[in-house]
């Protein structure tokens, strides 16, 4: 059992070596005396593929978490940079929402309670009133989906 009076300190995944698997990463987090690690699901194919991890892969990570006492309470989800929820392209918006669903289900399976997401409607496209409208509509859907899994969506502060 964790000491509720202890200050918990975590580390962002991208501050750790990239060339190790998740079980090794979790052990390293523990060795470095951190209590938790934040996982990144960015716009790269490699990290987006995590949303399709099998139950066996997830169970292997769960075992490492239990064995070490390390947690993964949050996800930085920036896959929407490449596939924005406010895109003028309907196919891109559909992909964005597919990724959002996968991220929520993945979070639920992993025990992740919070998904930080970008607060912009589009990134590589020109923003407009229409892209903002699409983003707002899709964000409302995403909030409903997340709430049904008891996952919190938070908007990351953007420059």
What do these predicted regions represent?
Residues 38-66, 119-126:
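Glycine-rich, proline-tolerant flexible connector loops at the mouths of alpha/beta enzymes
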Residues 2-20:
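Boundary/entry segment of secreted carbohydrate-active catalytic domains
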Residues 19-23, 55-59, 90:
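Structural motif corresponding to alpha-helix initiation and N-cap regions
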Residues 22-43, 110-111:
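Catalytic domains of carbohydrate-active enzymes, especially glycoside hydrolases
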Residues 12-16, 40-44, 77-80, 120-122, ...:
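Active-site beta-loop-alpha junctions enriched in small/polar residues
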